[in-house]
Each structure stands twice: as C-alpha cells, then as structure tokens.
C-alpha cells in the first residue's frame, strides 16, 4: 500500500454537498482538504453534461451515471426501477434536470419540530439558500446576488405553452405565484434553473470547485473509489480508497466528511462497520458501531407523464430531428442562447390535492414536448406533457450493503406506493391534471390525450397505469437521517451519533423529503453545516414573511 498522506479533512464524494464543503473549508488557508471522487472530471467540452437541453444524454450509459437499479418493487408490479446517480465532479448536479426548487417553507419548519433539529426552521435555512445563489435578475429578500451557483429565470418570448400551462392552472382555480422559491411556493408559475448566463449547466463543479481548485490547500483526486473509513476505537481517522487499481490511504487530522449521497453514504458506512449489526455480521464485517438507522428511512419522489398531442406546430418536437440539431448546437456553443441553453422545464406548479393538506403535496414540471426523461420513447408528433408526482409519500425504503467489494452495487428498495394514501394521491394527480389541461387556455393547442389515454378512467385503470409507468424523479434522500432517537444516524450538524471525527453531509440527512427537487436543498444544507465545521456563527435568521394556507381551500371556484 502506498504511503498514507495526511490532511485536516477528507471529503468523500465531489457532488452537490462535497463540493460546497471543499470550497468553504479551503477558504481558511491554514486548513488542508482532500476531496475524493469515484468518477472522472466534468469535461467542459462534453456537450452531454454542459448543454442544458442535452440533459437526457448523461442518464444514458455509465460514464456519468452509476445507473443503479432497485430490487423488484413489490407495489409496482415487481419492476426493477432506475436509480440514476451522478458520477464525476459535480455528482448528481452534473446529470440532473437543473430545476432550481428550494422546497416549501413548511418542509423546514416541520423538520425543526423534530427533537434536536430546532436549527433547521425555514428562516434559519433561507440565509444559506441566498448565500449559495446568484440570481440573474438580481437579489431580493428571498434571493442571493453573489453566490457560487448561477440561477436563470424564464424570460418573455419563450415557448407560449409555458404561459398557457400557468393560465390553465389559474382557470382551474389555483393561484398564480411569481416565484415558487419566494414568498409563496403554492400555485403555478415560472421555474428557475441551474444555468449560467452563458447557457451552461451550473453544476457545483462549475460554481464552487472552479474557484476552490486554484487553492494550494485543496487536493482533488478523481477516479478514487472509497473502500472504507478507518477508525481507531470510535474515532474516524482516515480513508482507504482505490485509484487506478492501486490501494491508497489518507489520514484525517480533524474529520472525515462523508458526502456520497443517499445511496453511497449508507453503503460506505455499512462497509466500514457502522450500521445494523445483523446486516454487517451476515457479510462478515466487524462492527465498529451499532447504528440501526443507517440505510433506513429511504425516500424518493415518483412521477408520471401526462401527455397530449399539440394541434399547433409550436412544440419542441423539431429540435429532436437530427437535421435541426447542428444549428441549435452552434447557437448554444457560440452565443449561449436558444433551445440548447434551457432544460425546457420553464413552468411548474405546486398544489394541494385536498383541502386538508397543510402545504402542496403535488408538483408539476411542464414540458412543451412529449418525451421520457431519459430521452427515449419520444412521441413522433408535436406534443406537450405535465410531469406530476406526490411530494411527501409516507412509504419508506432502505439501502443495504450486498458485498465488501467497493465496486458492487448495494441492494436498493424504495418500497414505492406502499401506503393507501400514495394511491389516492396519484389518482387525484391524474384527474386534476386532466382538469387543468381541459381548461380554455389549452383549447387552441390540446389534441388527443396520448398517455394515460382517454380509456384509462376507473381507479383500477389509473392504479395499473401508475404501476406500469410511474418513474423515479431521481430524488433519493433520508437514508442517514439527522435527529435524535434510535433510528437517527447523525445530529443536526451531521455528526454521526456515537462516533468522533465523522460527519455525513448530503441529502441522506433529510428527515423528510422536501416539496420539490433536491439539488438546491442539498447545497443549502452543506453551506449551513460548513459554517458549523469551521466554528463560525450561523448566519442570522431571516425576517421575511412566507405563505401558509391556514386551512384555505386548495382551489377557488373558477
């Protein structure tokens, strides 16, 4: 084994959280940091990861995607479902859909009601959302103007179907909101995106690491696959990893910071002897510390596509044609504008399916084309679709180690749709979506319903459609829950219970999945914990208003 090297901090995983920590910790010039990433660099010449409109490409193949699969999901016709996770500098921010959604204020207020998580209320989190962000139209009480992450807002003159979707939501009785990340998430409005002013994907590798990698106190090792965290007694003291087939070792003087994400973080903990002792003994792994919650509490968002043909030739369908792509690519490459510079998710909605929901439980992404997320099975016609999914399923799954081999995939079971409420929400989701698309705003555009199709009406027919066609939104989280109690893995600052010198900092900490996409909340969480690691005072709590429904009906009579 090569000579061990020593650093103050070792960060495992250069994803949305790990890159934040690497950048913030190395702002202190007397601190040395090693950042380990199992994937490769984020090649800036590769349009597949850099062009927002090409977001389907990195999900195909395994250069940038671990491309995990779930175990057969018992409530989903035993389908093995996709579980894509980013591989390379930027992690999943290198391959995600680039939607900049923070979640609902009440998500965080409800986290803060759990024992030990009092510091995670919305007004304590908002300053860290702002700290991380540069919004293209400037800062305000809810948005930042000088953070590492570029956020682009939709502009006038974009595809008319985006505005049509918002108008139809209003006609169906729902509110319009100017900013789903501002005062009021609930309603229909524009969707911001992680895209730079030059039309490039704003991954955390670009936003954070581009600054930090110039610093002499940061060492970045790519293609470095972590094997185990090493302990002396109950203290984490280093990491064993493999690089180009060679075993290597590094020691941490202060802390090991595990930022592998909701799949890899519990997997690495278990391989290192931290977790459910029964599971570890089955694999012959010596138990360093019993923590039965490692890998439990796994959550995700499921979603479906409700697709229609478009009667007017204004959808993005022509952009799929090979003969149109060179022009689109050239405009993006040289000007940073045009169809290539957008992820195409430019309007969205957050609604309550029933009056007794305290805050939105359904999310819409609207797309002016009919296609699946990974770019397959495009409808050969002008079309549009609404992606819809429930936000806070009570179903819980788990991540379980299958082998001591660091290259082996874990066993992943989300246990999707395990509760009766899941089925109620998805039936509501399909019926409410049809109601929205049936509004007068869509009359000029709405053609035949492609999917689920007009024949799918009864509860049983809708349930079968969900079983066969619902897909992951790629939002796994919760598998190393922060908090107190037997099943919590860390405290509110990511410190692993019962151990020293070890934190988990990523989406696996979320006790309950937020209402929306997970990249922005993951960056916020890492910014907040970075201050704790550095011994800095938390940023002062924000003092802004935010919308709470307080029993108002979910929709007004139209």
UniProtKB/Swiss-Prot annotation:
Please provide an example of a Pfam family that matches this protein in its UniProt record.
GMC_oxred_N
SUPFAM superfamilies to which the protein is assigned, alphabetical: FAD-linked reductases, C-terminal domain, FAD/NAD(P)-binding domain
Q: Which Gene3D superfamilies match?
A: FAD/NAD(P)-binding domain, Glucose Oxidase, domain 3
Sequence positions that bind FAD: 8-37
A GO BP term here is:
glycine betaine biosynthetic process from choline
Instruction: Report a single Gene Ontology molecular function.
Output: flavin adenine dinucleotide binding
Q: What is its EC number?
A: 1.1.99.1
Q: Which UniProt keywords apply?
A: FAD, Flavoprotein, NAD, Oxidoreductase
- This protein's pathway: Amine and polyamine biosynthesis; betaine biosynthesis via choline pathway; betaine aldehyde from choline (cytochrome c reductase route): step 1/1
UniProt catalytic activity: choline + A = betaine aldehyde + AH2; betaine aldehyde + NAD(+) + H2O = glycine betaine + NADH + 2 H(+)
Source domain of life:
Bacteria
InterPro entries recorded: BetA, FAD/NAD-bd_sf, GMC_OxRdtase, GMC_OxRdtase_N, GMC_OxRtase_C
Q: Which cofactor does it need?
A: FAD
Query: What role does it play?
Result: Involved in the biosynthesis of the osmoprotectant glycine betaine. Catalyzes the oxidation of choline to betaine aldehyde and betaine aldehyde to glycine betaine at the same rate.
Task: Supply the HAMAP family for this chain.
Answer: Choline_dehydrogen
Annotated family: Belongs to the GMC oxidoreductase family.
Protein name in UniProt? Oxygen-dependent choline dehydrogenase
The lineage, from the top, is:
Bacteria, Pseudomonadati, Pseudomonadota, Gammaproteobacteria, Oceanospirillales
Q: Which gene encodes it?
A: betA
């Amino acid at each position: 084994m090569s000579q061990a090297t020593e650093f103050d901090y070792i960060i495992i995983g250069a994803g949305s959280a790990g890159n934040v920590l690497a950048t913030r910790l190395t702002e202190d010039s007397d601190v040395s940091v090693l950042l380990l990433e199992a994937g490769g660099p984020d090649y800036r010449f590769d349009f597949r990861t850099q062009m927002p409109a090409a977001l389907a490409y990195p999900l195909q193949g395994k250069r940038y995607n671990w491309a995990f699969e779930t175990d057969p999901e018992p409530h989903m016709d035993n389908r093995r479902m996709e579980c894509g996770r980013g591989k390379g500098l930027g992690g999943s921010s290198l391959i995600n859909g680039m939607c900049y959604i923070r979640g609902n204020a009440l998500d965080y207020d409800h986290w803060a009601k759990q024992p030990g998580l009092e510091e995670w209320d919305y007004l304590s989190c908002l300053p860290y959302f702002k700290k991380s962000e540069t919004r293209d139209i400037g800062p305000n009480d809810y948005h930042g103007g000088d953070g590492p992450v570029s956020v682009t807002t939709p502009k006038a003159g974009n595809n008319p179907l985006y505005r049509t979707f918002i108008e139809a939501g209003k006609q169906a009785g729902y509110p319009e909101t100017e900013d789903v990340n501002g005062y009021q998430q609930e309603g229909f409005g524009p969707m911001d995106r992680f895209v730079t002013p030059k039309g490039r994907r704003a991954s955390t590798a670009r936003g954070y690491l581009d600054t930090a990698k110039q610093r002499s106190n940061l060492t970045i090792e790519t293609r470095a696959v972590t094997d185990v965290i090493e302990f002396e007694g109950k203290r984490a003291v280093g990491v064993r990893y493999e690089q180009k087939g060679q075993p290597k070792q590094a020691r941490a003087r202060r802390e090991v910071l595990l930022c592998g994400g909701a799949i890899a973080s519990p997997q690495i903990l278990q391989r290192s002897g931290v977790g459910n002792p029964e599971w570890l003994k089955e694999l012959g792994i010596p138990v360093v510390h019993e923590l039965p919650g490692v890998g439990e509490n796994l959550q995700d968002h499921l979603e479906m596509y409700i697709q229609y043909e478009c009667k007017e030739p204004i959808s993005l369908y022509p952009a799929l044609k090979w003969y149109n792509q060179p022009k689109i690519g050239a405009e993006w490459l040289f000007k940073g504008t045009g169809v290539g510079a957008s992820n195409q998710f430019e309007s969205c909605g957050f609604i309550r399916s029933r009056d007794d929901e305290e805050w939105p439980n359904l999310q819409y992404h609207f797309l002016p084309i009919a296609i699946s997320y990974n770019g397959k099975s495009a409808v050969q016609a002008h079309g549009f679709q609404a992606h819809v999914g429930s936000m806070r399923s009570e179903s819980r799954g788990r991540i379980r180690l299958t082998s001591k081999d660091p290259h082996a995939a874990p066993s992943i079971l989300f246990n999707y749709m395990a509760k009766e409420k899941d089925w109620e929400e998805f039936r509501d989701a399909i019926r409410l979506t049809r109601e929205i698309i049936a509004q007068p705003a869509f009359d000029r555009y709405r053609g035949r319903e492609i999917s689920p199709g007009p024949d799918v009406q009864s509860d049983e027919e809708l349930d079968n459609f969900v079983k066969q066609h619902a897909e992951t939104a790629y939002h796994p989280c919760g598998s190393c829950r922060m908090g107190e109690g037997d099943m919590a893995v860390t405290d509110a600052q990511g410190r692993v219970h019962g151990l020293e010198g070890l934190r988990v900092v990523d989406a696996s900490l979320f006790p309950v999945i937020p209402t929306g996409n997970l990249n922005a909340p993951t960056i916020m969480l890492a910014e907040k914990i970075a201050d704790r690691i550095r011994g800095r005072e938390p940023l002062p709590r924000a003092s802004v208003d935010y919308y709470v429904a307080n029993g108002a009906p979910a929709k007004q009579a139209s």
